């Protein structure tokens, strides 16, 4: 069985790392390069950088900081935010990113997923899914979630979108359960289980990690391939080496920390 991945997520705004609760009230968490190097040294398996203002502000991601990160770390990293064309994705990948993640642009033009997969290969194409449970009990997707004032509901069931994204060429799905984001009460295991039943590509859990047990629950109960987290790593509440030792003690296979 492949090792499960531990993935710090760094939300980027104006070249700084920020973090909010349920995508609101963002506070500064530090320098992007310093945090990236820290996580690399601690044994992170990969990193995700999300330019949270790019899509809501209808601009492209700034490749200057991508080039800076690529020179500093030697683990895979993915870039998300404002990637709305093959040309933009090419700039991001050529700047040093290993993968691109698309979310709002794919909802506006789903064929973008196929275009990117055809051009760069499915291994480079991640589809991020921001999901909210609505009053009727159904999970539905949101777009432009990087800015609470611009977030839009989309009349599309989360599970239906996961199926369509795979059909169009997504090589990986990151399911961000927005109701859990930043509150540290655990991943939405029920939603992840339903997504896992439909997901034939790697599935990454996002939103809600607050304790080491939450990672184990996502791996054991939802069989996700990786777990993404932000605030617990940025704040120092959980250190990656200790987390990996804990997971190995739970018979969950993770890569060694070198």
UniProtKB/Swiss-Prot annotation:
Its EC number is 4.3.2.10. Keywords: Amino-acid biosynthesis, Cytoplasm, Histidine biosynthesis, Lyase. One of its GO terms (biological process) is L-histidine biosynthetic process. It is found in: Cytoplasm. It catalyses: 5-[(5-phospho-1-deoxy-D-ribulos-1-ylimino)methylamino]-1-(5-phospho-beta-D-ribosyl)imidazole-4-carboxamide + L-glutamine = D-erythro-1-(imidazol-4-yl)glycerol 3-phosphate + 5-amino-1-(5-phospho-beta-D-ribosyl)imidazole-4-carboxamide + L-glutamate + H(+). Pathway: Amino-acid biosynthesis; L-histidine biosynthesis; L-histidine from 5-phospho-alpha-D-ribose 1-diphosphate: step 5/9. It holds the Pfam family His_biosynth. The active site is at residues 11, 130. It is an enzyme of class 4 (lyase). GO terms for cellular component: cytoplasm. CDD domains: HisF. Its main location: cytoplasm. One of its GO terms (molecular function) is lyase activity. IGPS catalyzes the conversion of PRFAR and glutamine to IGP, AICAR and glutamate. The HisF subunit catalyzes the cyclization activity that produces IGP and AICAR from PRFAR using the ammonia provided by the HisH subunit. Heterodimer of HisH and HisF. Belongs to the HisA/HisF family. This is Imidazole glycerol phosphate synthase subunit HisF. The lineage of its organism: Bacteria, Pseudomonadati, Pseudomonadota, Gammaproteobacteria, Lysobacterales. The gene is hisF.
């Amino acid at each position: 069985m492949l090792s499960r991945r531990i993935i710090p997520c760094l939300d980027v705004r104006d070249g700084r790392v920020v973090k909010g609760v349920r995508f609101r009230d963002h506070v500064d968490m530090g320098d992007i390069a310093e945090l990236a190097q820290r996580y690399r040294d601690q044994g992170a398996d990969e990193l995700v950088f999300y330019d949270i203002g790019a899509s809501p502000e209808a601009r492209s991601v700034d490749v200057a900081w991508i080039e800076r990160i690529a020179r500093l770390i030697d683990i895979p990293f993915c870039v998300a935010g404002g990637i709305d064309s093959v040309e933009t994705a090419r700039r991001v990948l050529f700047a040093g990113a290993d993968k691109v993640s698309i979310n709002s642009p794919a909802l506006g033009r789903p064929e973008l997923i196929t275009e990117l997969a055809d051009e760069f290969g499915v291994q480079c194409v991640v589809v991020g899914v921001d999901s909210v449970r609505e009053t009727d009990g159904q999970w539905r997707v949101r777009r432009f979630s990087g800015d609470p004032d611009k977030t839009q509901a989309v009349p599309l069931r989360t599970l239906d979108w996961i199926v369509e994204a795979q059909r169009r060429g997504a090589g990986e799905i990151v399911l961000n359960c927005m109701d859990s984001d930043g509150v540290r009460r655990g991943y939405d295991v029920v939603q992840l289980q339903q997504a896992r039943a439909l997901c034939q590509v790697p599935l990454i859990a996002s939103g809600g990690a607050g304790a080491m047990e939450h990672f184990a629950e996502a791996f054991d109960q939802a069989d996700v391939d990786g777990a993404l987290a932000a605030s617990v790593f940025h704040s120092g509440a959980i250190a990656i080496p200790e987390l990996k030792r804990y997971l190995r003690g739970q018979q969950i296979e993770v890569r060694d920390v070198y």
